[in-house]
Amino acid sequence: MTLLKKIDSPYDLKKLSMGEMNTLAQEIREGILNRVNKIGGHCSPNLGIVEATIALHYVFNSPVDRFIFDVSHQCYTHKMLTGRKSGFIGDIIKNISGFFNPSESEHDPFVLGHTSTSLSLASGVAKARDINGDNYNVIALIGDGSLSGGEAFEGLNNAATLNSNFIIIVNDNEMSISENQGGLYKNLKELRESNGTSSNNFFKTFGYDYHYLENGNNLEELITLFSSVKDSNKPVVLHIHTLKGNGYVPAEENKEMFHNTVSGRINGKTPIIPSNLPETYGSITTEFILKKHEQDKSIVAITAATPGGVSFTKDFRQKMGDAYIDVAISEEHAMGFTSGLAKNGAKPIFAVQSSFVQRTYDQISQDIALNNSPVTVIVHCGGMSGIDMTHLGTFDISMISNIPNIVYLAPTNKEEYLSMLDWSIEQVEHPVFIRVPLGEPVTTGKVDKTNYSDLNKYQVVRKGSDVAIIALGTFFKLGKKVYDRLKQAGFNPTLINPKFITGIDEDLLDRLKDEHNITITLEDGILDGGFGQKIASYYGDSEMKVLNYGGKKEFTDRVKVTELYERYRLTPELIFEDVMKLQSGNLLYA
């Protein structure tokens, strides 16, 4: 990596010849593959945008000119060219994130990680520039299906009214995470096939100047195109056709698998693809849906462009046929669409990751809960993890559980999960959300016969006295460990599996007061507005002392789960210490 080692800023790039920059592009690809193989990350999106990013930094003048990448998952080349190559070559400096982060560099204007936001952010930057009387280029790069998101349409509509410099680069690699979905992409296909000359041009209807480049991986042509619009005085769209996974044959041939991959998959030209994958809650879900669909054709499976993230594999999608619907990157629409299906007699199952539920609050409240639509929403990745700060799964409990009419369930094992799914699909009284447990499936081998229509009834797993442990969902495993630790110390605790996030079992809580003086709540999410605070509020000024355990209301960035557990005192030993201090009257934060 002779050339890359010499690049510490875009200024160094501008000194290179065309031949040297093409060589640099190959070195950058080696850096991308090195990082992804060692720590995982977005592979094929970054391989496809190498030349375009080099051309951007060669033609424009970052950080004076502002680059705003949609999602920013395709920022690896950008980072290598802006002084952060240590995150990609050699042993990898892991504190370099896989997304834009202003704390790392002035070349990253925003913290980014969710989709379809670039046009809104960039148009705001451009408008402020005009108000301030400044003069620089504002460039938004959007691709990988992000144009299908509602905010992208809104941003595109608003930015078209700017009478000043605003450059949109549409990175058209013919893919979202999986296949592109929706009518917009039919128009992009028509534009590609006509070399950008079709009179049916989505962007021109908004009033944008439009330029098409067929070979979006040709560095020289990209530099020519970008130079032609530099310092333009009106909004313009540059539509570049790129190859997702370019330069690494396995990623070119399997774009979806290599969109975002785990470490250890890359071995020269032969990818390491695991076989005999273990059972997961995702595979349990798809197997269940397929069996139900064989018996009931009204069942519909829905995703918002993240089929892999919710285990909707290609095989599953093919078997479901028209009953599988990918609504593209449009979670807000997905919630409304799901409500419409349910209200008209279908049985929709929308699978979505916790972090993306945040985008849909109004649709959950208005379109689903207010209408009491009997939807089933499966929430994946809810809980603490070592993920970056843009994809945290710790806010869904507080958000969803405080909306009226919603029933939010927290299974602790495979059998409960299947029972909840079956009940939710067949009942017609409530909107139901189910928080999928984190980690490997736990199985009891016994069918769960709970009647979930009897709302907010907790299960007493082990009856005792003195201390009651109410352990929600994924943290039921922690609850059992706390139970064992207290038992070891001579306590006779009660262990409770609440199953319901959205309500409290008042009868049970009242009975606990007879033989218990301490209640512990455990939840895998933030405490503020969460499950445990409802228990504490119910006990109010009674003699029951309540210890709530969960996360702090904060954005954590790639912090190890074990470190988070220590930080939040989520270990059996630390919880035991708190119980002992509370009994002696020395606990200050009870």
Where are these regions (language model features)?
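A short, small-residue-rich loop immediately preceding and capping a beta-strand
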Residues: 39, 65-68, 111, 132-149, ...
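Non-catalytic terminal/interface segments that mediate subunit docking, oligomerization
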Residues: 248-357, 363-373, 471-473
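A glycine-rich helix N-cap at a beta->alpha junction
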Residues: 86-96, 161-175, 369-381
